[in-house]
């Protein structure tokens, strides 16, 4: 629950100022967040003192202040706590300054809020339990349609028991630290920036803003009222107005009803005190519903913040009291008695809710502080982001300015160049005009010459047409010849390719023949070597045969000594035959061994020759591939070169033909134009 806080009525007591002086709207400072008992709410001053104060107020320069509504009291507390240290509150919207007017039919000052509003606008006091942000949202959604104040949301643990049945009363409360019941009295009117009302006194503005039924205003019921009422109010509710003096002071001033936040009793007969009156009120009050929900307090308490009709600051001096003031005093005595009873009942209700309200207030204050800290951080972050964004935008703008300056310089240079070109063109135009004036007579002569040659031109035109037809025919023939030449070139190219291929094959064949001749020569050399080896082997065989024969003979000699007697009787021929057979067998074996070695050598040689032949064949194939690829590339290059040459010749020829046609058309067109002009001049 937010703290209830009111703004006091600060009236400067300067030197004597005339009643017609204009009043300025100022905003009073926020009062201290102090608490007091309910007994401090009742003023202990006499009515005579108040009459003296009222007489002094009219002669001073009054600076009325705004009396804030209940929903502004939370902002007042927050601003008083944070305005000195947080610059973010400078941007919060302030309430409109109040206007102070004095009525034609009264002697009291009415300090009202929003005096510029419509007189029929309803005023709904707002519960102190509602938050300022909730109030703003409700105003934004509902506009001027205002309903009863919202119920208090239970925050502390004490308020969660009977939420549906019982509602917290929007009454003043005192702090946890107890104080005396009879605290020092504080007056409503603060002089020269004195200390403001306590929060307990200012919070009673809600108590007296109960259900008040608006009664139509009766104007000019009383012509004048005196401000010389005196009386006393005590805590026990004893009120007696019988001892009030009825004499008037030297000068009585007309004042509007003052709407004070503590619900101070207004002595004007136009003020609605109990919510109903048989006399004319100063303005319509706003019907409200009390947050406590009690019918006894809501019906008995009235709104003292009503607005009075605007009137001029006019007063009359030395007026005598009238009978209506006495009747009003009696009615006020009865009303004050009822009010004292209500105050006693409110005192009883006050003590019941103080502890819970204090706890709720502390919790809400902590939440408000947290929200303000978050708001400060978010605002600082937004300011930082905005500064960074502004810096980036400044850099971008500087870059754009630099680019625009460069473009401006370029445009200035281009403009200067264009001016120079313009001057040159003007000079040329002037020279052309001079030449035109000079060539005028010559042009007339040339016209007559053109008339003479127009006939020749017509003949030349006919000849030109014939020549163009012949040229078209010749061009067709040329195209046919070109096609034939292209075909012949393609045939020639094909034949050249075939000849080249045949030359390549012949060259390869010659290379193969050379290789074969080399191989044959090598084979011959190898055969000679083999013959030499064979002759050497024959010689060796002959030597071996001789050695074998000698060995056989030596062996035979040795054998004869050991022969049996039977062999001795053999003939010499048989011995010779046997020796020859043995020698032949040995020679045959040796020859077989030599033949085997020769075949192995021949086989090895053949294998080497085959491997050499394979390598030679592979190398030859690769060589032929490379040669064929090179020939193909060379042929392609030659073909492309020839095609490019042909295309260049064709392009040149076509360009010449086009130029010739353009020249012919230009000549024909120019001749026709001149002829028409000449004909027109002759006509």
UniProtKB/Swiss-Prot annotation:
Gene Ontology BP term (one): nuclear export
Region (Disordered): 1-37, 82-107, 262-320
Cross-referenced InterPro entries: LZTS, LZTS2
Comp. bias regions, Polar residues: 11-37, 96-107
Keyword Manganese listed: no
Cellular compartments annotated: Cytoplasm; Cytoplasm, Cytoskeleton, Microtubule organizing center, Centrosome
Pfam family, one: Fez1
Coiled coil: 324-665
Organism domain of life: Eukaryota
Gene Ontology cellular-component terms listed: centrosome; cytoplasm; microtubule; midbody
Major localisation: cytoplasm
Annotated keywords: Cell cycle, Cell division, Coiled coil, Cytoplasm, Cytoskeleton, Microtubule, Mitosis, Wnt signaling pathway
Low complexity bias (residue ranges): 290-308
Disulfide-bond pairs as recorded: none
Physiological role: Negative regulator of katanin-mediated microtubule severing and release from the centrosome. Required for central spindle formation and the completion of cytokinesis. Negative regulator of the Wnt signaling pathway. Represses beta-catenin-mediated transcriptional activation by promoting the nuclear exclusion of beta-catenin.
Family listed: Belongs to the LZTS2 family.
Protein name: Leucine zipper putative tumor suppressor 2 homolog
Organism name: Xenopus tropicalis (Western clawed frog)
Taxonomic lineage of the native organism: Eukaryota, Metazoa, Chordata, Craniata, Vertebrata
């Amino acid at each position: 629950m937010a703290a209830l806080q009111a703004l006091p009525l600060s009236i400067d007591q300067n030197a004597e100022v005339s009643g017609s002086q204009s009043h300025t709207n100022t905003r009073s400072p926020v009062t201290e967040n102090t608490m007091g008992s309910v007994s401090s709410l009742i003023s202990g001053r006499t009515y005579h003192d108040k009459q003296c104060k009222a007489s002094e107020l009219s002669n001073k320069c009054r600076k009325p202040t705004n009396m804030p509504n209940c929903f502004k009291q939370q902002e007042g507390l927050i601003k008083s706590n944070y305005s000195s240290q947080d610059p973010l509150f400078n941007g919060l919207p302030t309430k409109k300054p109040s206007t102070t007017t004095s009525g034609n039919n009264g002697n009291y000052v009415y300090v009202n809020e929003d005096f510029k509003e419509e007189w029929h606008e309803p005023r709904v006091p707002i519960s102190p339990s509602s938050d300022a942000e909730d109030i703003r949202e409700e105003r934004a959604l509902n506009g001027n349609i205002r309903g009863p104040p919202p119920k208090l949301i239970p925050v502390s643990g004490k308020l969660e028991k009977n939420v549906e049945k019982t509602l917290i009363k929007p009454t003043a409360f005192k702090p946890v630290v107890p104080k005396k019941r009879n605290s020092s009295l504080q007056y409503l009117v603060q002089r020269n920036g004195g200390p403001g009302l306590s929060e307990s006194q200012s919070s009673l503005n809600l108590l007296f803003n109960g259900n008040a039924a608006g009664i139509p205003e009766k104007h000019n019921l009383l012509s004048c009222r005196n401000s010389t009422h005196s009386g006393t109010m005590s805590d026990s509710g004893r009120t007696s107005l019988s001892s009030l003096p009825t004499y008037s002071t030297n000068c009585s001033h007309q004042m509007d009803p003052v709407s004070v936040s503590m619900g101070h009793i207004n002595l004007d007969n136009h003020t609605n005190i109990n919510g109903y009156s048989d006399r004319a009120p100063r303005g319509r009050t706003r019907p409200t519903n009390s947050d406590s929900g009690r019918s006894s307090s809501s019906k008995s308490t009235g709104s003292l913040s009503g607005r009075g009709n605007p009137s001029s600051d006019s007063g009359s001096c030395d007026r005598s009291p009238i009978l209506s003031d006495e009747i009003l005093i009696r009615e006020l005595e009865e009303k004050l008695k009822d009010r004292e009873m209500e105050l006693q009942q409110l005192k009883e209700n006050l003590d019941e809710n103080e502890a819970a309200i204090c706890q709720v207030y502390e919790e809400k204050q902590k939440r408000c502080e947290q929200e303000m800290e978050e708001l400060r951080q978010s605002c600082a972050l937004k300011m930082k982001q905005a500064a960074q964004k502004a810096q980036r935008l400044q850099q971008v703008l500087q870059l754009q300015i630099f680019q625009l300056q460069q473009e401006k310089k370029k445009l200035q240079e281009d403009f200067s160049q264009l001016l120079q070109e313009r001057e040159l063109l003007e000079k040329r135009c002037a020279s052309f005009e001079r030449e035109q004036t000079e060539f005028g007579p010559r042009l007339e002569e040339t016209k007559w010459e053109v008339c003479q040659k127009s006939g020749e031109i017509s003949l030349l035109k006919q000849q030109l047409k014939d020549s163009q037809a012949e040229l078209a025919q010749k061009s067709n023939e040329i195209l046919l010849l070109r096609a034939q030449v292209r075909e012949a070139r393609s045939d020639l190219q094909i034949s050249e390719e075939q000849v080249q291929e045949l030359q390549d094959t012949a060259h390869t064949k010659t290379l193969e023949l050379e290789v074969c001749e080399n191989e044959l020569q090598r084979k011959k050399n190898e055969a000679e070597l083999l013959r030499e080896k064979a002759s050497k082997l024959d010689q060796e065989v002959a030597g071996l045969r001789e050695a074998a024969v000698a060995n056989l003979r030596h062996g035979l000699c040795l054998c004869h000594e050991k022969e049996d007697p039977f062999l001795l009787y053999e003939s010499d021929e048989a011995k010779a035959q046997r020796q020859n057979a043995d020698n032949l067998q040995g020679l045959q074996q040796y020859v077989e061994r030599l033949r085997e070695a020769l075949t192995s050598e021949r086989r090895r040689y053949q294998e080497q020759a085959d491997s050499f032949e394979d390598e030679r064949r592979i190398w030859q194939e690769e060589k032929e591939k490379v040669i064929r690829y090179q020939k193909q590339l060379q042929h392609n290059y030659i073909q492309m070169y020839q095609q490019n040459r042909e295309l260049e010749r064709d392009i040149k020829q076509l360009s010449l033909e086009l130029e010739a046609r353009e020249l012919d058309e230009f000549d024909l067109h120019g001749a026709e134009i001149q002829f028409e002009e000449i004909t027109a001049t002759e006509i």
